[in-house]
Amino acid sequence: DAGASGRARVNLNRFDLAMLKPFMPEATQASGVFTGNADVSWDTTKEGLPQGKVTLSGRNVKVTQVVNDAPLPVAFDTLNLSADLHNNRAELGWLIRLTNNGQLDGQVQVTDPQGRRNLSGNVNISNFSLAMINPIFARGEKAEGRLNARLRLGGNVKSPQLFGQMQLSGVDIDGNFMPFDMQPSQLAMNFNGTRSTLQGTVNTRQGQIAL
């Protein structure tokens, strides 16, 4: 019995992802080590949710997923995750740096999780290379280009809103599934609440397609 009120602290020391192998599908492999800690307090005699914070940090983490009978490896230089619940606000944060690739970072807040559940926060993608997915393509097919995004969250959990821009620069996808021979192109997706617009120019050997 945890009692009507109390506090718990837990440390996670060198949790090896190999221990999860029996619970993973055959097409997924994971390696690396996680460390972290959790600090949670509760008081059932008062209204509201428990208070607490959880942090996780990965080291030498690598995930390989088999897609179309080909392995797609993803290695992480940095993999930090955090979750916090204090003062009637829940927050999730992340910082992910891919080996020889870009960075993903951001945070999402939910204010009044038991009531209005208002959303705020941001999602950032920096210099992410599409070439990472080339291992799953057939011979002669490829993807190139860089993805960058600066996005902001709004609205609430029931009706989320997204603001900002996502850009693809130098994007060039060659494959039998493409209806034309694509050349390096520029694309941008602009988000304004519940609406979005696609802009840019797709270059082909036959000319340009303006969006």
What label would you give each PLM region?
Residues 1-152, 157-211:
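Interface amphipathic segments
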